[in-house]
């Protein structure tokens, strides 16, 4: 336990919270070619590679992912949620934060139904999460 005098000389430091989606906290000034500290809830990017990867143990599947070059020139791996997708190389996608627990290194999700990404077809429940329009009654 420190004395009052020790605390006066050297106060306690507050913990610095590390971001779980650091690529969303960086902007880019293309005129000056410098990165800036601009936080944003989503970012636009171009898919450079689309493929599948296998999850960690004990799960088994082929999870769809895309390697995306963001508008701030950072390249990240993002998960494509839902059943089926229309993404290919050079598709323009919208990214949000949110990791996939059983895929190491995947910290971002692609937003379905935005930009070049189509919503999930034939989806009746939880449509807003997958960019599906309301079906005609």
UniProtKB/Swiss-Prot annotation:
Gene3D superfamilies xrefs: Nucleic acid-binding proteins
GO cellular component: small ribosomal subunit
Protein's GO biological process: translation
GO molecular function: rRNA binding; structural constituent of ribosome; tRNA binding
Keywords associated with the record: Methylation, Ribonucleoprotein, Ribosomal protein, RNA-binding, rRNA-binding, tRNA-binding
Annotated region described as Disordered, given as residue ranges: 1-57
Residues with the 3-methylthioaspartic acid modification: 102
Family annotation (HAMAP family): Ribosomal_uS12_B
Homology family: Belongs to the universal ribosomal protein uS12 family.
Subunit structure: Part of the 30S ribosomal subunit. Contacts proteins S8 and S17. May interact with IF1 in the 30S initiation complex.
Its job: With S4 and S5 plays an important role in translational accuracy. Interacts with and stabilizes bases of the 16S rRNA that are involved in tRNA selection in the A site and with the mRNA backbone. Located at the interface of the 30S and 50S subunits, it traverses the body of the 30S subunit contacting proteins on the other side and probably holding the rRNA structure together. The combined cluster of proteins S8, S12 and S17 appears to hold together the shoulder and platform of the 30S subunit.
PANTHER family in alphabetical order: 30S RIBOSOMAL PROTEIN S12 FAMILY MEMBER
Protein name: Small ribosomal subunit protein uS12
Species whose genome carries this gene: Streptococcus sanguinis (strain SK36)
